[in-house]
Amino acid sequence: MCYTLGFVTGVLFLLFDRSPFVRFHAVQSTLTFSTITALVILLPVLPGGALLSRVVMAFSIILWAFCIVKASRGEAFKLPIFGDIAEEQLSLNYT
C-alpha cells in the first residue's frame, strides 16, 4: 500500500504505521517517487529533457508496478540507493 500513490502514500504510512516492514517501504517509496517526480518536473527545462522526462515517467510506471507487487506479497526488497538510505534511516537490515 505504501506505493499506491507514490510518495504521498509513503509519507502517510510513515506517519501512521509502526510496523518496521511498512515503515521501510514507506521511506523507500517516499525517497524513490519524490525523486522521480522532481526529475519529471525539472528535466523538460534542459535541451532534450522533454524526451528524457517521458522515459523517466515510463520507467517509473514499471518500477511502481514492480514495487506494488513485491510489497503486496510481503517480500522484503531494497531498491538500489533508496533502499540503502531507507534502511539507514530506520536502522534496519532487511536483505
Curated annotation (Swiss-Prot):
Annotated TM spans: 2-22, 32-52, 55-75
Main location per the UniProt record: membrane
One of the record's GO cellular component terms: plasma membrane
UniProt topology in membrane: Multi-pass membrane protein
Keywords annotated in UniProt: Cell membrane, Membrane, Transmembrane, Transmembrane helix
Location(s) in or outside the cell: Cell membrane
Family (UniProt): Belongs to the UPF0132 family.
Official protein name in the record: UPF0132 membrane protein AF_0736
